[in-house]
Curated annotation (Swiss-Prot):
Purpose: The beta subunit is responsible for the synthesis of L-tryptophan from indole and L-serine.
Record NCBIfam families: trpB
Subunit structure comment from the entry: Tetramer of two alpha and two beta chains.
Cofactor needs: pyridoxal 5'-phosphate
HAMAP family noted in UniProt: Trp_synth_beta (MF_00133)
Family, per entry: Belongs to the TrpB family.
Annotated positions of the N6-(pyridoxal phosphate)lysine modification: K99
Name recorded for this polypeptide: Tryptophan synthase beta chain
Species the sequence originates in: Rhizobium etli (strain CIAT 652)
Amino acid sequence: MNETPKPNSFRSGPDEDGRFGIYGGRFVAETLMPLILDLQDEWNKAKTDPAFQAELQHLGAHYIGRPSPLYFAERLTAELGGAKIYFKREELNHTGSHKINNCIGQILLAKRMGKTRIIAETGAGQHGVASATVAARFGLPCVVYMGATDVERQAPNVFRMKLLGAEVKPVTAGSGTLKDAMNEALRDWVTNVEDTYYLIGTAAGPHPYPEMVRDFQSVIGAEAKEQMLAAEGRLPDLVVAAVGGGSNAIGIFHPFLDDPSVKIVGVEAGGKGLQGDEHCASITAGSPGVLHGNRTYLLQDGDGQIKEGHSISAGLDYPGIGPEHSWLSDIGRVDYVPIMDHEALEAFQTLTRLEGIIPALEAAHAIAEVIKRAPTMSKDEIILMNLSGRGDKDIFTVGKILGMGL
């Protein structure tokens, strides 16, 4: 691990080149550079524009349903017999996950820039649904690129996107998952720069996307902080979230980064184990490289070729991670740990039976880590976990594995 000097604040990045230490940046085709700089310029203006912020907050309250509740998981806490467990209930948002927070923010930006066509990539389909939703709300055509493998395992979300008026384009290249969908979306963007806005769904991609997505998702952590102080009179001892590209995680982590009493853990997809290639634990088992416009930890071979990862959860099935997470790992502020498919599956069932909440398989990875850690902590300690999405979309996957025909 690089011995990077600790900054005064963990929340001041990225620098003007979009870098978090050695990570991030803008590695894009020349044709995209003017567009990226234009986007950055508009983003900088929007950040400080009271009218933009007011519209964002209004839609957050009346369209998304914010603030999402902070929920004390009483039965899970009792069952594990250790720390008190609280969930930030992002699965109760409109469209069923945290993805909508970012989509509303970015579509307002797209309109501000005068763009008339939206493109997006999606893995689990949650970002695709959220993109199609905001495109419908603002009357813009939307094309969603989705890996053919994911189209198959996320049928309900594909149908939702089509209902919402989006065109879903299955991508058969590579392993037909999120990485391949993102490649296709970038190709589309390069050829349609004039009228098209690329609505990236995770805290990755070229600058300013990682910063922008983080800022739109930070509403999660900001609300949770306030709600936790109201409920317990203090901050949590531990904050946990699942990490694929890392937008739900950075959204809850960021407001807590400068609170030294708060330990932070990101949970990666351990898949079928770290020994082979069937996992998506980019930080635990990857190395730095460049993909989709930014430098970050990636799953790659000795020649720098991107490996095809695996996770039971389509939303974590990405061979990279947002650059800010790479930096936070290197400087030791956040710990990143893997959870295997079977552990996530077990946690999925545990939460459903104990709390009456069916979580997304992505969030089930975080629950599995909470189940491991809570019993090792004292009863007066507090865990805050981001319950990033609901599991309706995953019942077919889980049903198949458990041998229950649907």
